[in-house]
């Protein structure tokens, strides 16, 4: 199973929880992490390959004047996977999703003459493009099984890039993927991308927290599931401590800032720094648990020096 995930720097913290849950339930051979740095020091699993989007070829990093700047550069990377990755197919999962079960059956799907597999997007967004016949075909791009070989062969990547450069879309990458691939989609059960718009189902294998209602924001639908894996990750690592701090949550997509009290995970040195900077915002450091979690020791309290 080969996975691709894209994450901006302010989501690295949440990415660690997603990876923990993914590795817990699945045999994964490689994870391509598209990030804004050369690596994330505390994510040391050998299955992870970091790709710094700022060092990709210029033709990928260059924005068209028609690109919708409401979304980050990271949002468009999916349209370039066929050019960047030397793979036959990949499974893309958004950084705000959590894998809660084994998804090998999803990976094993033979796409044949289909460009990708995804879950139908219900509700108000299914017909926002105004394209005849699109209502029952529009998919959410948060979880995609992508046939890179076919996309290269039929030059669908070129078609997507051309649309990005010549027309403005409400949801740029998701819209162009739907427009270009609308007749080449294998439709999946919503258990593989359970959202508020695709349907929040009890037997979901991948829960996708869309819009501002993220899993790490307490009170969001099914946030207790995200926190279940978050807490497991803490318990199974010997390199973590908890601290309390004020965090400023900045979601550019909805243009507001929220201050919340929350527990974040940092190394001991970082914890000492936080204690002297109580107003520090955007704490996004976490350590990846050991590969063999059964051998990891729980953190122990240090005795006070007399």
Positions of predicted regions on the chain:
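A glycosyltransferase accessory/donor-loop signature
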Residues: 1-7, 17, 33, 141, ...
């Amino acid at each position: 199973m080969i996975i691709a995930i894209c994450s901006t720097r302010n989501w690295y913290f949440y990415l660690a929880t997603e990876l923990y849950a993914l590795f817990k339930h699945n045999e994964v051979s490689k994870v391509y992490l598209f990030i804004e740095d050369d690596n994330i020091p505390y994510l040391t699993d050998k299955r992870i390959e970091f790709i710094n989007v700022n060092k990709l070829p210029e033709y990928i990093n260059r924005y068209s004047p028609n690109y919708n700047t409401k979304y980050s550069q990271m949002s468009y990377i999916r349209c370039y996977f066929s050019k960047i990755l030397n793979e036959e197919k990949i499974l893309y999962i958004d950084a705000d999703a959590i894998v809660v079960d084994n998804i090998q059956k999803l990976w094993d799907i033979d796409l044949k003459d289909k460009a990708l597999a995804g879950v139908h997007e219900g509700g108000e967004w299914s017909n926002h493009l105004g394209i005849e016949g699109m209502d029952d075909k529009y998919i959410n791009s948060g979880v995609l099984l992508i046939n890179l070989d076919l996309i290269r062969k039929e030059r669908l990547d070129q078609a997507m890039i051309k649309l990005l450069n010549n027309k403005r879309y409400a949801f740029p990458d998701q819209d162009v993927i739907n427009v270009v691939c609308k007749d080449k989609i294998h439709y999946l059960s919503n258990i593989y991308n359970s959202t508020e718009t695709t349907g929040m189902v009890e037997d979901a294998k991948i829960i996708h927290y869309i819009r501002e209602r993220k899993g790490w924001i307490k009170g969001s639908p099914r946030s207790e599931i995200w926190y279940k894996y978050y807490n497991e990750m803490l318990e199974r690592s010997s390199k973590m401590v908890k601290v309390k701090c004020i965090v400023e949550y900045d979601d550019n997509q909805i243009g507001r800032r929220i201050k919340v009290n929350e527990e974040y995970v940092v190394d001991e040195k970082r914890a000492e720094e936080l204690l002297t900077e109580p107003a520090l915002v955007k704490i996004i450091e976490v350590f990846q648990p050991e590969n063999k979690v059964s051998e990891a020791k729980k953190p122990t309290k240090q005795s006070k020096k007399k």
